[in-house]
């Protein structure tokens, strides 16, 4: 990492991780949590969640960017998904997706490959989809996050 990137990582660890403040990264914000991304070259991320952000390599006929509604398959309990049921739909707009995040993956969707939809590690959460564009399901995710922030921020 170069100086400015180290500063960002250090500040993230100081302000969010160490203090236990809830953090929600949406779309690119989630992608920044990983070790590295290959979007427009190879770039180091914050390294908070192991894994990489890679371009889609999809079967013929599937379009990139992935834009549209997909159902969420919840893999494990996660406070961010407190008001969400398995199979509810969320809205995606992206050309890259996270892979290799293992135990930190809370929910996935299917788009030619399993797409990590929600990650969670401690007080840090991320969604690849856009909750603000995901109707009632998205509002319920934002409601759960809002509840986590009460008295903390």
Report the location of each language-model feature.
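Short, small-residue-biased leader/transition segments that mark boundaries at the very start
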Residues: 1-8
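Acyltransferase
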Residues: 127-153
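Catalytic nucleophile loop
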Residues: 16-35, 49
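Beta-strand-turn-beta hairpins that frame and shape the catalytic cleft
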Residues: 87, 120-124
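Short, conserved "post-DEAD/DEAH" coupling segment immediately C-terminal to helicase motif II
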Residues: 11-14
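Histidine-centered divalent metal-coordination motifs
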Residues: 27, 94, 130
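Pocket-forming structural segment of enzyme catalytic cores
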Residues: 35-113
